[in-house]
């Protein structure tokens, strides 16, 4: 009998949400995603020590300024981990721009180009890389410009429909709407504590975004992210891609039985609305208290882990 992970792969491209190379070898995903928190976790793994040492040594060659060395080494470590992962996945690695730049379009573009250059210098072409940016107005504008220059982007920390619409209209390659963090908010802020998978507010959000994109012929890839249980994952079978943590990949692989496709669109393509303006985007996003809370929290958490990573690097310089 087939297992649920194999069955899911019939309908959806499976991506590993981890920086753990051992997990890549085990589950053989198409792509992989990382973020500052995952890079920080990966940096604690003994087998990665050589990647850290290489990043530190490289940074010392680039500058005599300690602050710049920390920035350079942190960027190089993220790319070094990405390079190791790319040896194991046939597709793309997503590497994230410093979350502290989430409200600065030009700085985000500059950092993205810096990361791309590090990959290119290591022999990796742009078609194997996605640059992750937070789905702020400024992040979306940065992605729009980068896409025009041949740098594909993954817009993350996406919680509101306004964010999803703006990303599609900007022509970004891929979005990562978060499922589990939406569920977390509703459990913490409403009286309802249990949800059937089909009623899970994170599942509903991704399903609505998927349908809207397909209805209007947007080519932006929808990649559901941040799962709390396999019920959420199975309810999104058919989504373009799903990025899944190793623990849930393991649970799927150990669960027997075929699954059914839940997301699909076979209808006609409808006319697209006029592009959302900045003021409309900000107002519509602000009307969703969950999205406001979780976007801000996500940026803060990634920034904290970026700073922890920089401190760890600084101690080695």
From Swiss-Prot:
<dbReference type="GO" id="GO:0016744">
    <property type="term" value="F:transketolase or transaldolase activity"/>
</dbReference>
<dbReference type="InterPro" id="IPR001585">
    <property type="entry name" value="TAL/FSA"/>
</dbReference>
<dbReference type="GO" id="GO:0005975">
    <property type="term" value="P:carbohydrate metabolic process"/>
</dbReference>
<dbReference type="GO" id="GO:0009052">
    <property type="term" value="P:pentose-phosphate shunt, non-oxidative branch"/>
</dbReference>
<dbReference type="GO" id="GO:0016020">
    <property type="term" value="C:membrane"/>
</dbReference>
<keyword id="KW-0704">Schiff base</keyword>
<dbReference type="InterPro" id="IPR004730">
    <property type="entry name" value="Transaldolase_1"/>
</dbReference>
<comment type="function">
    <text>Transaldolase is important for the balance of metabolites in the pentose-phosphate pathway.</text>
</comment>
<dbReference type="InterPro" id="IPR013785">
    <property type="entry name" value="Aldolase_TIM"/>
</dbReference>
<comment type="subunit">
    <text>Homodimer.</text>
</comment>
<keyword id="KW-0570">Pentose shunt</keyword>
<dbReference type="Pfam" id="PF00923">
    <property type="entry name" value="TAL_FSA"/>
</dbReference>
<keyword id="KW-0963">Cytoplasm</keyword>
<dbReference type="InterPro" id="IPR018225">
    <property type="entry name" value="Transaldolase_AS"/>
</dbReference>
<dbReference type="GO" id="GO:0004801">
    <property type="term" value="F:transaldolase activity"/>
</dbReference>
<keyword id="KW-0808">Transferase</keyword>
<feature type="active site" description="Schiff-base intermediate with substrate">
    <location>
        <position position="132"/>
    </location>
</feature>
<dbReference type="GO" id="GO:0005829">
    <property type="term" value="C:cytosol"/>
</dbReference>
<comment type="pathway">
    <text>Carbohydrate degradation; pentose phosphate pathway; D-glyceraldehyde 3-phosphate and beta-D-fructose 6-phosphate from D-ribose 5-phosphate and D-xylulose 5-phosphate (non-oxidative stage): step 2/3.</text>
</comment>
<comment type="similarity">
    <text>Belongs to the transaldolase family. Type 1 subfamily.</text>
</comment>
<protein>
    <recommendedName>
        <fullName>Transaldolase B</fullName>
        <ecNumber>2.2.1.2</ecNumber>
    </recommendedName>
</protein>
């Amino acid at each position: 009998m087939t297992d649920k992970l194999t069955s899911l792969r019939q309908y959806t491209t499976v991506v590993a949400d981890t920086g753990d190379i051992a997990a890549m070898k085990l589950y053989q995903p198409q792509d992989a995603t990382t973020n500052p928190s995952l890079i920080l976790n990966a940096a604690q793994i003994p087998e990665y020590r050589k990647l850290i040492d290489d990043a530190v040594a490289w940074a010392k060659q680039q500058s005599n300024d300690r602050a710049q060395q920390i920035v350079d080494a942190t960027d190089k470590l993220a790319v070094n981990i990405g390079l190791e992962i790319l040896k194991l996945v046939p597709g793309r690695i997503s590497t994230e721009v410093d979350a502290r730049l989430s409200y600065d379009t030009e700085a985000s573009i500059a950092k993205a180009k810096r990361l791309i250059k590090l990959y290119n210098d290591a022999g990796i072409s742009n078609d194997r890389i996605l640059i992750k940016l937070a789905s702020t107005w400024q992040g979306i504008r940065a992605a729009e410009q980068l896409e025009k220059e041949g740098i594909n982007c993954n817009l993350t920390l996406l919680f509101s429909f306004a964010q999803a619409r703006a990303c599609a209209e900007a022509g970004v390659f891929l979005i990562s709407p978060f499922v589990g963090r939406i569920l977390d908010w509703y459990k913490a802020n409403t009286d309802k504590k249990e949800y059937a998978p089909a009623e899970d507010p994170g599942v509903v959000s991704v399903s609505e975004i998927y349908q809207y994109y397909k209805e209007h012929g947007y080519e932006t890839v929808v990649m559901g992210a941040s799962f709390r249980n396999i019920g959420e994952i199975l309810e999104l079978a058919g989504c373009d891609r799903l990025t899944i943590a190793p623990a849930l990949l393991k649970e799927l692989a150990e669960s027997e039985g075929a699954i059914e496709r839940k997301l699909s669109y076979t209808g006609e393509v409808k006319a697209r609305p006029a592009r959302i303006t900045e003021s409309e985007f900000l107002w519509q996003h602000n009307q969703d208290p969950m999205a406001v809370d979780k976007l801000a929290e996500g940026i803060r958490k990634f920034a904290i882990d970026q700073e922890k990573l920089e401190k760890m690097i600084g101690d080695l310089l």
